[in-house]
Amino acid sequence: MSSISLIPVCTDVAIRDMADMASAIWHEYWPIVLSEGQIDYMVDTMQSFEPIKYEIRQEGYLYWFVLDEEGKRVGYLSVRPETPEGELATDIQPGEGKLFVSKVYLLKEERGKHYASRMLDFCEDFCRANGLSSLYLHVNKHNEMGIRAYKGRGWYIAEDSVSDIGNGYVMDDYIMAKEVALS
């Protein structure tokens, strides 16, 4: 099974590198589902330097580069610990919080190597280490490969979500969730 390591993204240089990787991944992966205009808009407003920096510095998101066995960057991961109400979790009782898995992305040539499974294992371990009893994420309803992979790991569709993201675009997602045993 492929192993990974995760390196925290904290500096402006690392954030810029991550934004470059995000743009490359998004422009390669999403044209089968989203228009080029929506991809550009979402990268600019959610996956570029300023939005990532804001999420890290102001909203409590944690970002990591994912490295393969040789130390090569193969993708990135982002999460945010939250209260049951969806607020940033800073001081909660064990079992009361949840983990928002915001971003799970791999470069094209790195998919199919079980890195995404290791990334999700990391998220579950993060929950156990921090007393968070569940995980959730948003997945595009047309991302059949992602939905199938999550279901195969015990995730379930918790609800439908259609969100206006501005500029005439919407995110048409499923919110998928998974409970985590803390003991």
Where are these regions (language model features)?
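Acetyl-CoA-dependent GNAT
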Residues: 8-32, 38-109, 120-122, 126, ...
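C-terminal "cap" of GNAT-fold acetyltransferases
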Residues: 3, 12, 93-99, 133-136, ...
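Short C-terminal domain-edge/linker segments immediately following a structured domain
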Residues: 37, 49, 108-111, 115, ...
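Intrinsic low-complexity, intrinsically disordered segments enriched in polar/basic residues
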Residues: 1-2, 74
